[in-house]
Every structure is written in C-alpha cells, then in structure tokens.
C-alpha cells in the first residue's frame, strides 16, 4: 500500500509510521504518472482529498487506467454539479462507490426507500453502490442487493468510512469481485467496530 500525498503533508503520514510508503504528488498529472506503475493495482480516492479540480481530475485519471477503484467522500462530492461525467467514466468497471446519505443525495435524485434508491443508483452508474448507514445497503448494477445488519453505533465515529473504503480496496486488489468485496468490507468494518468500541 502506497499513500499518494502532497509533499507538504508527507510528514503527517510517516511521523508515526516510518515504514509507510508514500509518493508525493502536486497535480493530477503527477498522480497520472504514479498510475503508470502497474504494481498500483487498486486506487482509493476521496478521504481528505478536498473538493477541488485536482480531486476531480484524479478520479477521472484513476478511472481511465482500468484498475480497481473505491471512491468515497470528496471524490464523490466533487461531481455534484455533473454526476453524469463520473458515471460515464466508471460504468462497467471494478469500482465501488461508498457514499453516506448526504453524498448520495448530491449525485442521485432518487426518492423512495433506501434499498430501491441504492439499486437504481447502481443500475444508473454501472458499478456497485454502497449506501452507508445503520442499515448499509450494497447494490450491484445487475439488481442484486444486500443489507448489512451488524452495524454498531460505534460506526458513527469519524474516520470509520475511510477505514471501510480501505478495507474494500484491499479485498478488491486480492481479486474479490466488487459486490463481494463491498459486502465483506462492510461486515468486517462493523465487526471491528463492535470489538474495539469508540475511538
């Protein structure tokens, strides 16, 4: 696992974990250069990225290289003005979107129950959509959907969604299909939260 990060923030990632691999990047072109290394078999964009043009361009660059992708947080919100641009870029790929209700509503205008909305969203964008909450719904473009039932209240702690996104990516790059990786990631995340509690 390598964390691509602006140079001015590298020390934040390596201070307590000197063995953590980091690569500096300033622009989306720098990020695209990192993606030329085929050993980078999966890409997570979103947590802490910022809602800006660089995040927008990084998402599109990641989608273009055809690797496994998880998009969370800012990587979703940055497309709120033009969600179709995101959907065109990712449709049919091994990609998982992990929005909470607020992020979901910025991309999709569906009404109805959570299960129906998640299914419609997955069908529309052509990838797995994981709509987070106490009853997280994981939906596939083919209509299959699952509802997680083991979520403890400790998952409302900041950062648990980032951990979830990373867990899903780890499963994806090991060859697990997107729907199964999302389901397993949600279950593992909830189980860990129940075991370790808040913090």
Regions found by a protein language model. Name each.
Residues 1-70, 77-96, 101-199:
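Small-residue (G/A/S/T)-rich helix-start motifs and N-terminal tracts that mark the onset
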């Amino acid at each position: 696992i390598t964390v691509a990060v602006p140079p001015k923030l590298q020390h934040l990632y390596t201070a307590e974990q000197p063995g953590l691999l980091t690569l500096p990047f300033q622009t989306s072109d720098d990020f695209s250069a990192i993606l030329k290394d085929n050993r980078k078999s999966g890409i997570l964009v979103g947590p802490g990225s910022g809602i800006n043009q660089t995040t927008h361009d990084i998402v599109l660059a990641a989608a273009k290289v055809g690797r496994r992708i998880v998009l969370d947080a800012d990587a979703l919100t940055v497309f709120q003005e033009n969600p179709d641009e995101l959907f065109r870029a990712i449709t049919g790929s091994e990609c998982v979107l992990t929005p909470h209700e607020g992020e979901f509503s910025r991309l999709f205008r569906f009404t109805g129950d959570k299960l129906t909305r998640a299914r419609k969203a997955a069908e529309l964008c052509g990838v797995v959509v994981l709509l987070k909450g106490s009853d997280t719904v994981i939906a596939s473009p083919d209509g299959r959907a699952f509802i997680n039932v083991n979520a403890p209240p400790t998952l409302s702690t900041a950062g648990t969604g980032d951990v979830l996104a990373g867990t899903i990516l780890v499963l994806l790059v090991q060859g697990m299909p997107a729907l199964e990786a999302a389901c397993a990631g949600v279950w593992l995340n909830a189980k860990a939260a129940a075991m370790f509690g808040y913090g």
